[in-house]
């Protein structure tokens, strides 16, 4: 009998301005894996030309915990598809260091806003960041102690017992409530009804909640309706924020990159704007993890920025099919009998774990004060029976479809990655 494994990742983010000078040193194993999978999922897991936002960090955190229990060909396939390094010890260490860096950032006290950041210069609210991981496992199931010890030590993910056999629906409600609490009510009903059954054995969850104000707010009085050109060329009027100041900037082959920093300077919004109104598809073909890493340290220049306000709340993503199409088939027991998570729990031909689905849900809103975003991902496991620097001030009008990311500057990690085709 195969037992389902569910991995949930949730992330919420609230942000609000920053800059491209030099590329990062070689990105860490975790940062590279996060960004590379994000690029893959944006291209393969979402419909071209539509609004979308993913949390590559959230997705990878849950899958990295799952990977800690994989063995044999299942592990080999996951290594390739998830862009992991062969040195697994170093990989988990890298994810642990990234989690610590994010948690440390979220634990900093209230900062005094720079002049002009808040009217009157009063203290601004600090960046609020919570990163939480948890395992929800079947009560009494024989999970291997080394696996449990690794994910708790490295990912801060304790095991919470749930009796899926007696009442899978009650377990689903409990997990969704935990997700909702961690994401400040931005992510609700992550795991849909009937997704968990009496065969469910483990749900792996990552949650990130981030609320960060801009380093300098956009003046509310400057916001006005301006035309935004949709992918078919039609203009629509949308509320557009405007601000002039030092921001990161680079003019590259066919597009511009602008970074707008958040308070504290450890996070920024990256905007990748095609030069032409119909250039989004060509830009997405150029998108690579190396490009994202290079954009993490931009050159400061004087920018006149016009940026639309927007709010995105796509439905739950089911990522299993996309991960299969990328080559990660054995983890989903395809072909039957191939799933091998023996390092997570003892495997026999008639009783073993497999991934049944990976659920992911996001939320993001951007306005004059900052950005709020949330995401959640769940991996369910089931039991089975068999750059160029400008020299003059630059006007950047974000008035047609573009790509965006919320980046952790020092590592280049994309906490969120998406596209905006229609801000309405």
Predicted regions and their residues:
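A short acidic/small-residue loop/turn micro-motif
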Residues: 420-424
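Bacterial N-terminal signal peptides
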Residues: 7-16
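Non-catalytic, conformational "gating/processing" segments within enzyme and secreted inhibitor domains
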Residues: 49, 88-277, 296-389, 393
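Positively charged n-region of N-terminal signal peptides that target proteins for export
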Residues: 1-5
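Generic short beta-strand
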Residues: 403-405
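Mature N-terminal segment immediately following signal peptide/propeptide cleavage
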Residues: 32-46, 51-57
């Amino acid at each position: 009998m195969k037992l389902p494994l569910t991995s949930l990742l949730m992330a919420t983010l609230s942000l609000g301005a920053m800059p491209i000078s030099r590329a990062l040193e070689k990105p860490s194993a975790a940062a590279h894996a996060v960004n590379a999978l994000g690029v893959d999922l944006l291209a393969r897991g979402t419909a071209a030309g539509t609004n979308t936002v993913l949390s590559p960090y959230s997705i990878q955190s849950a899958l990295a915990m799952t990977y800690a229990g994989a063995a044999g060909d299942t592990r080999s396939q996951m290594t390739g598809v998830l862009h992991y390094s062969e040195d697994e010890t170093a990989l988990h260490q890298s994810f642990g260091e990234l989690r610590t860096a994010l948690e440390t950032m979220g634990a900093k006290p209230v900062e005094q806003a720079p002049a002009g950041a808040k009217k009157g210069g009063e203290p601004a609210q600090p960046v609020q960041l919570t990163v939480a991981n948890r395992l929800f496992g079947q009560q009494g199931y024989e999970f291997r102690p080394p696996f449990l010890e690794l994910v708790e030590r490295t990912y801060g993910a304790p095991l919470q017992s749930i009796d899926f056999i007696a009442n899978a629906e009650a377990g689903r409600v409990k997990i969704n409530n935990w997700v909702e609490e961690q994401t400040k009510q931005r992510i609700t009903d992550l795991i849909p009804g009937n997704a968990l059954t009496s065969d469910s054995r483990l749900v792996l969850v990552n949650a990130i909640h981030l609320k960060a104000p801009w380093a300098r707010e956009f003046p509310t009085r400057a916001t006005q309706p301006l035309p935004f050109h949709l992918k078919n060329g039609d203009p629509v009027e949308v509320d557009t924020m405007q601000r002039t100041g030092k921001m990161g900037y680079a003019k590259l082959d066919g597009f511009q990159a602008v970074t707008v920093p958040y308070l504290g300077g450890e996070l920024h919004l990256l905007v990748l704007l095609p030069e032409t109104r119909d250039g989004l598809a060509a830009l997405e073909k150029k998108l690579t993890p190396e490009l994202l890493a290079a954009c993490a340290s931009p050159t400061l220049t004087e920018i006149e920025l016009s940026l639309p306000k927007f709010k995105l709340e796509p439905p739950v993503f089911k990522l299993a099919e996309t991960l299969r199409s990328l080559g990660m088939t054995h983890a989903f027991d395809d072909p039957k009998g191939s799933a091998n998570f023996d390092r997570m729990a003892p495997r026999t031909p008639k009783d073993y774990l497999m991934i049944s689905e990976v659920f992911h849900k996001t939320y993001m809103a951007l306005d004059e004060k900052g950005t709020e975003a949330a995401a959640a991902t769940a991996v369910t496991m089931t039991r089975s029976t068999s750059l160029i620097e400008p020299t003059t001030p630059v006007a950047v009008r974000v008035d047609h479809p573009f790509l965006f990311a919320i980046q952790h500057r020092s590592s280049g990690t994309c906490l969120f990655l998406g596209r905006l085709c229609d801000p309405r």
